[in-house]
Amino acid sequence: MDILSHIALVLVPGLGNASIRKLIGLYPDENLFALSKGDLETVFGRHKGIAECIANRSTFARAEQELTFCEKSHIRPLFFTDAAYPARLNRQETEDCPVLIYCLGDCDLNPERSVAVVGSRRATAQGRDNTCRMVRELAPWAPHIVSGLAYGIDSAAHTTALDHGLPTVAVLGHGLDRIYPTANRPLAKRILDNGGALVTEYTSGTAINPRYFPARNRIIAALSDATLVVEASEKSGSLITAAIAGSYQREVFALPGRVTDPYSKGTNRLIARNRALLVQDVRDIAFQMGWPIEEAPQTDAAKEAEHSLTEAEQQVIALLQEHERMTLDELTSHTGHTLAEMVSILFKIEMLGLVHTLPGHVYQVAHA
C-alpha cells in the first residue's frame, strides 16, 4: 500500500494500532482497500462497520487532505513498515504505539542512543538546574534527547540539548499545524533549525485536548532507551511516562529530592517503590546502560569531590588510574589498609561517583 492508503487505514474508526499491525502481518503484500467487501467481512467478522468503511474507501477524502497538508508543510508520514519509522516503536512490548506518525524535521529517529528527560511543568529553579546539568553531562555520549515541549522540565531539556549540540525530539499531543504551548513556538523553531524533530500521531486540525497528552507520553517512552524523571509531584504526568517506560522494559531513572519537597514526592515515590533507579549524576545512567564510562569527562560534581579527598582516598584513585581495574584484595594489599578501612574508602569514593563496582568486587575509576 502507498502512504495515502496507510493514512486512510489509520483513519478507519474502530481500527486500532495493534489490529493494524496484525492485519499487515496477515496481508503483507495486499492492499486492504482492494479486497472485496465479502473478504473484508470475513476478516473482521462481527465488526462489519470497519469492513464497510474500508470497502467504501470512506476515509480517503480525509486522507488526501492530510497528505496534501504534509506535502505542503514538509512533514514525513512514517508507517511502521517504513525504514525511517522508529525501530524502538516496533518492538513486541510496544505494539500499542502508533503505526503511523508524522515527523517534521530531518532528524534520524533511529539513533544509537536516546534518552527521555521529563518532569514537572511547574518546575522549581533547582529542577531546571538539575535538568540542565544532567543533559549537559550526557553530551559526551551524544544521545538524542526526547521530551514533550511542555513548560518546565521539558523546555529545559530541549533547550540544554540544543545548547550542547544534541539532537532533540519533541513529541506533541496534537497535530503539526499548531504548537502548544504557543509560548514555545520559538523553541520548536530552534529544534527544527538545529536538526531536531517534532513528532506526533495526530492529524492536522486535532484540537488541544488534555486526554491526548498521556497517550503522547507513550511515544516519548518508546522512542527512548531510558527515561529520566528529574522532578515530579505526586500527580505529575511524567509519572505516566515513567510507568509506560517500565512496561516497555526500558530503564527508568529518577533524581531524588527532599522528602518535604512537594515537587519531589513523585520522584521519591518512584525510587521507594523500585520503579526507578536513583541517580545523582549521568555516570549512574551510563553505568546502568553499559555506555563507555571511561570516554566521558568528569562531571562537575566529581571535579568538586576530588578536592575534598583524603590522602588515602587519593591513593586508591591513583592506583585505579594506573592499573585500570583492581580487586578489593589487590587494593588492600597495595595500600596496606585493613579490609574494613578499604571498604570504607571505596564506599565513599563510589558515592562521590569517582569509581564504579564491577562484578566480583572489582573496581574501576569512573573517568579516564
Give the label of every model feature segment.
Residues 2-3, 80-368:
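Glycine-biased, small-residue-rich flexible motifs in mid-sequence functional cores and linkers
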Residues 1-84, 270, 352-354, 359-361, ...:
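Short, small/acidic-rich helices and loops at N termini and domain boundaries
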